[in-house]
Amino acid sequence: MRFSGSPSPGPSNSSRWWPLDAGDANTSGDLAGLGEDGGPQADTRNEELAKLEIAVLAVIFVVAVLGNSSVLLALHRTPRKTSRMHLFIRHLSLADLAVAFFQVLPQLGWDITYRFRGPDGLCRVVKHMQVFAMFASAYMLVVMTADRYIAVCHPLKTLQQPARRSRLMIAAAWVLSFVLSTPQYFVFSMVEVSNVTKTYDCWANFIHPWGLPAYVTWMTGSVFVAPVVILGTCYGFICYHIWRKVRGKTAGRQGGPAEGAGESALYRGVLHARCVSSVKTISRAKIRTVKMTFVIVTAYIVCWAPFFIIQMWSAWDKNFSWVESENPATAIPALLASLNSCCNPWIYMFFSGHLLQDCAQSFPCCQNVKRTFTREGSDSMSRRQTSFTNNRSPTNSMGTWKDSPKSSKSIKFIPVST
């Protein structure tokens, strides 16, 4: 990398979306001047490592595009009412597709051609969009977790124009991601990386010696550290709130019902049976979405942590040797950061089984899967209705309720509106 104000170019370019690239230490040779025969040194690289990088990026791109496109297709075709969680899943899938097309795909082409092939303006746009996709994926995860925090810890606020608030949060994540990634236009440009071979590449320029560490630290903090802190705080409050609710319900059961309640207690219990069941169902749905979001956050941290550790190490350690970056053990973890965009779609489908069913409906070859899901769903619904009719719903099965020895003919059952 070449630092502005430094006497000579550094050893590495920045073909990755960051100013540092663990896989491009092989460019140090073309900056050394003349070869052993006195002629210009060839512009070469570690071809074995380059092939490995190309293969990994190609697999990540294909899997990310297929997975996230399937989720978007399933959300579009689902006959169910769209929820706020579906809205966040849709935009997180769009952010993951942005990672695939704006970050992984340009890097794949760049690794194939070795040097950036394009004008200075295209160099700046590509670098901007690569970092924009990183910001969008991270910040969309933050707003989705914030929505789960509001739904669990402040449920009354969900009644106050929840759709409008969710759309504002999503729009803020997109706009903030675009704004925070604009410095890439001023950091990167087409630079002559060899005075001998007259080779140009898309490189970053920094003020020596503090520019590079400051930039990498800022990007690490804004893309990784700050989101992880916010996510951890939200989940801390969510877990504490759920723990308090569980403890309160346990204490209530231990107290038991008051004696002498008589027919009025039975009457109230009958009237509110469906309401209590609905509340329990909503609570289970919230907990399921909280679990799904937690798994997504964990996958984000696991995939991105090695990348940021390598970047911070290479920026702050003065003894860092660029020869070490030619080791696949150092280069591949930096590439696997984008693997997070491949994991998210399967997490959605695991926690929302109907998404897989709705996606299967779009492909004729998956009609057997569709019929299996439909048959299992019908059997499950039939079992639930039978159990509810025989045991819990006197308003739907008068005969069963009258046969009970504990029933009272003086009780009048009023239909409960749902």
Swiss-Prot record:
<feature type="topological domain" description="Cytoplasmic">
    <location>
        <begin position="352"/>
        <end position="418"/>
    </location>
</feature>
<feature type="modified residue" description="Phosphoserine">
    <location>
        <position position="404"/>
    </location>
</feature>
<keyword id="KW-1133">Transmembrane helix</keyword>
<dbReference type="InterPro" id="IPR017452">
    <property type="entry name" value="GPCR_Rhodpsn_7TM"/>
</dbReference>
<keyword id="KW-0325">Glycoprotein</keyword>
<feature type="lipid moiety-binding region" description="S-palmitoyl cysteine">
    <location>
        <position position="365"/>
    </location>
</feature>
<feature type="transmembrane region" description="Helical; Name=5">
    <location>
        <begin position="218"/>
        <end position="238"/>
    </location>
</feature>
<feature type="glycosylation site" description="N-linked (GlcNAc...) asparagine">
    <location>
        <position position="26"/>
    </location>
</feature>
<comment type="similarity">
    <text>Belongs to the G-protein coupled receptor 1 family. Vasopressin/oxytocin receptor subfamily.</text>
</comment>
<feature type="topological domain" description="Extracellular">
    <location>
        <begin position="110"/>
        <end position="124"/>
    </location>
</feature>
<feature type="topological domain" description="Extracellular">
    <location>
        <begin position="314"/>
        <end position="331"/>
    </location>
</feature>
<feature type="transmembrane region" description="Helical; Name=6">
    <location>
        <begin position="294"/>
        <end position="313"/>
    </location>
</feature>
<feature type="topological domain" description="Cytoplasmic">
    <location>
        <begin position="239"/>
        <end position="293"/>
    </location>
</feature>
<feature type="glycosylation site" description="N-linked (GlcNAc...) asparagine">
    <location>
        <position position="319"/>
    </location>
</feature>
<keyword id="KW-0812">Transmembrane</keyword>
<keyword id="KW-0449">Lipoprotein</keyword>
<dbReference type="GO" id="GO:0045907">
    <property type="term" value="P:positive regulation of vasoconstriction"/>
</dbReference>
<dbReference type="GO" id="GO:0042277">
    <property type="term" value="F:peptide binding"/>
</dbReference>
<keyword id="KW-1015">Disulfide bond</keyword>
<keyword id="KW-0564">Palmitate</keyword>
<keyword id="KW-0597">Phosphoprotein</keyword>
<dbReference type="GO" id="GO:0032870">
    <property type="term" value="P:cellular response to hormone stimulus"/>
</dbReference>
<feature type="region of interest" description="Disordered">
    <location>
        <begin position="1"/>
        <end position="20"/>
    </location>
</feature>
<feature type="transmembrane region" description="Helical; Name=3">
    <location>
        <begin position="125"/>
        <end position="146"/>
    </location>
</feature>
<feature type="compositionally biased region" description="Polar residues">
    <location>
        <begin position="383"/>
        <end position="399"/>
    </location>
</feature>
<dbReference type="GO" id="GO:0001992">
    <property type="term" value="P:regulation of systemic arterial blood pressure by vasopressin"/>
</dbReference>
<keyword id="KW-0472">Membrane</keyword>
<dbReference type="Pfam" id="PF00001">
    <property type="entry name" value="7tm_1"/>
</dbReference>
<dbReference type="InterPro" id="IPR000276">
    <property type="entry name" value="GPCR_Rhodpsn"/>
</dbReference>
<feature type="glycosylation site" description="N-linked (GlcNAc...) asparagine">
    <location>
        <position position="195"/>
    </location>
</feature>
<feature type="transmembrane region" description="Helical; Name=2">
    <location>
        <begin position="88"/>
        <end position="109"/>
    </location>
</feature>
<comment type="function">
    <text>Receptor for arginine vasopressin. The activity of this receptor is mediated by G proteins which activate a phosphatidyl-inositol-calcium second messenger system.</text>
</comment>
<feature type="disulfide bond">
    <location>
        <begin position="123"/>
        <end position="202"/>
    </location>
</feature>
<keyword id="KW-1003">Cell membrane</keyword>
<dbReference type="InterPro" id="IPR001817">
    <property type="entry name" value="Vasoprsn_rcpt"/>
</dbReference>
<feature type="topological domain" description="Cytoplasmic">
    <location>
        <begin position="76"/>
        <end position="87"/>
    </location>
</feature>
<keyword id="KW-0675">Receptor</keyword>
<feature type="compositionally biased region" description="Low complexity">
    <location>
        <begin position="1"/>
        <end position="15"/>
    </location>
</feature>
<protein>
    <recommendedName>
        <fullName>Vasopressin V1a receptor</fullName>
    </recommendedName>
</protein>
<feature type="topological domain" description="Extracellular">
    <location>
        <begin position="190"/>
        <end position="217"/>
    </location>
</feature>
<dbReference type="InterPro" id="IPR015076">
    <property type="entry name" value="V1R_C"/>
</dbReference>
<feature type="transmembrane region" description="Helical; Name=1">
    <location>
        <begin position="52"/>
        <end position="75"/>
    </location>
</feature>
